[in-house]
Design a protein with these regions (language model features):
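Sec-dependent bacterial lipoprotein signal peptides
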Residues: 1-24
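...with weaker cross-activation on analogous glycine-rich loops/strands in unrelated enzymes
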Residues: 36, 85-147
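Catalytic cysteine-centered active-site loop
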Residues: 56-107
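Bacterial Sec signal peptide processing site at the extreme N-terminus
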Residues: 18-42
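Glycine- and charge-enriched low-complexity intrinsically disordered segments
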Residues: 150-161
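Recognition helices and adjacent regulatory flanks at domain boundaries
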Residues: 47-51, 57-58
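Stable alpha-helical elements in mature extracytoplasmic
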Residues: 42, 46-49, 69-70, 74
Length: 161
């Protein structure tokens, strides 16, 4: 009889141990899974976001209409318009999704630029030729990827949806 009680107690302890280990497991990384989203829906959502934020001043670390930085604008756009949680910083955003060539850009793809020795910039492609971003000098704007500056500093593009 004591062995039955001991066996039952061991199973309970083992079960609790398994539950504890499972509860401590790290959650999956956000926006790592790439799944199709209709491009016209994404494009429409991006234009809605641009209309709402157009001209908002650039502010490093900013996350509001009082001022927003480039990765903050990307973070807020994906969260509010596309229902996706992306990392907050440009560096971490540059590590998610799948790499795409500039010729394959679609609305919603992230475009990354190396604008200085240790400086990165991110925006969101509207199509193969334009992107929306928080510019240090102009705030939230649409810029052309054909512009010499952006062509020379283009680092990579990634698809995260």
């Amino acid at each position: 009889m004591n062995s039955v009680i001991l066996s039952r107690a061991c199973r309970v302890v083992l079960g609790l141990g398994i539950l504890l280990v499972a509860a401590c497991a790290a959650p999956p990384k956000s926006a790592q899974a790439v799944h199709p989203v209709e491009t016209t829906t994404v494009e429409s959502a991006l234009y809605d976001q641009y209309q709402a934020w157009q001209g908002t001043a650039y502010r490093y670390g900013g996350m509001s209409k009082a001022g927003v930085d480039c990765s903050g604008f990307v973070y807020l756009t994906y969260r509010d318009q596309l229902g996706m949680q992306l990392p907050r910083t440009t560096l971490h955003q540059s590590r998610i999704g799948q790499a795409v060539s500039p010729q394959q850009l679609q609305a919603g793809d992230l475009v990354f630029f190396l604008t200085g020795p240790n400086t990165r910039h991110v925006g969101i492609a509207l199509d193969k030729h334009r992107f929306v971003h928080a510019s240090k000098s102009k705030g939230v704007v649409v810029s052309s990827l054909a512009n010499d500056y952006w062509q020379q500093t283009l680092w990579q593009a990634r698809r995260v949806y």
